């Protein structure tokens, strides 16, 4: 916790420890960080015998009072995840796509208003991410892009993230502080907003957004529904936070790497223009543009939106990772940022090279930004849709560069680990093509 409080860069601290001490590093009284690709399948993929660690129990261990993400019992998680998968299915995404497109168009209009002048794309990517999730999550618009300002409820979320970065290594302390009157005042603005909007959504049982799928399941007595009133309130909060900050960070980071690597950006533009020779008016989502996906995958390799390892607990009998025995009841994790930048597993590991993915598979490489197995992020396809839409539209319309000589360094050095990445301003200048 001392290191976390100093610089809020736990992902870099963990990487440094592995460079110094090797593949297996003790990072807590009974906690190990394991920097090996072979550990990924053992820890995260079926038929793993690990379970989620106590870190996930910061709210409660009672499954009727927690979100899907806090659920530690595999059978319960597997059941509850089914309704989320309905709300995030390809069929559902087809319904959401025009609404996401509308937010992309609004984002592009704001970029147009700043043409030739610096614009903080960290801020506008955040506006975009939360506006999208407000719409497809609740059919509610935060109007952040329109007003070019942060909604008060969302500001409360971001004011609370610093505590997670510092205290998240001691989950019981974070839980204790959250119960001190006034200590969680900022976050309470967000919880109040979610509760109010959830009550409004109960009047609408037509699944036009993600939360209505959960409410429909609850009203119909579906076993996959959130198991109680508190559980669905927690799911509502999870929906907005998990679906917004992660995608926003990925979009900002992709723009950072493309501005830093003009040749990669030009290749992306050429790949998109080849599919849409008539420009933006020809654009459709159904075109397969491999290099666009390579850019996204490479961005998530170098700067995963959740950079730390996702902790699991070994079964009582322990388990083997290669030739190493890990005792039972030990918290273990593969450090995402570290394993995705290890030179043993990646050539020119710290370089942005989207073309490396021409001969690589996301499932066979040590690439885990969405994690693996039953606990994997159910929103992966939604995130990819948002990123493909936003990046392809920007590439079709604009060239871009950093606003000043130090903009790149300021952005790269200012990243903080608050479970998800908290990013500094990214000042870019866009020029119409």
Can you say where each PLM-predicted feature lies in the sequence?
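Conserved cytochrome P450 K-helix/beta-meander segment immediately N-terminal to the heme-binding cysteine loop
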Residues: 334-360
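N-terminal membrane-proximal hinge/A-helix region immediately C-terminal to the signal-anchor transmembrane segment
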Residues: 1-79, 94, 99-110, 128, ...
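Cytochrome P450 heme-thiolate monooxygenase catalytic core
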Residues: 52-61, 95-251
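C-terminal helix/juxtamembrane-tail motif
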Residues: 418-433
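Short, small-residue alpha-helix embedded
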Residues: 246-259, 390
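Hydrophobic, well-ordered secondary-structure elements that form the walls
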Residues: 268, 299, 329, 352, ...
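Conserved cytochrome P450 K-helix E-x-x-R motif and the immediately C-terminal K′/meander segment
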Residues: 3-15, 196, 279-322
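Cytochrome P450 heme-binding "Cys pocket" and the immediately downstream C-terminal segment
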Residues: 262-264, 363, 375, 380-418
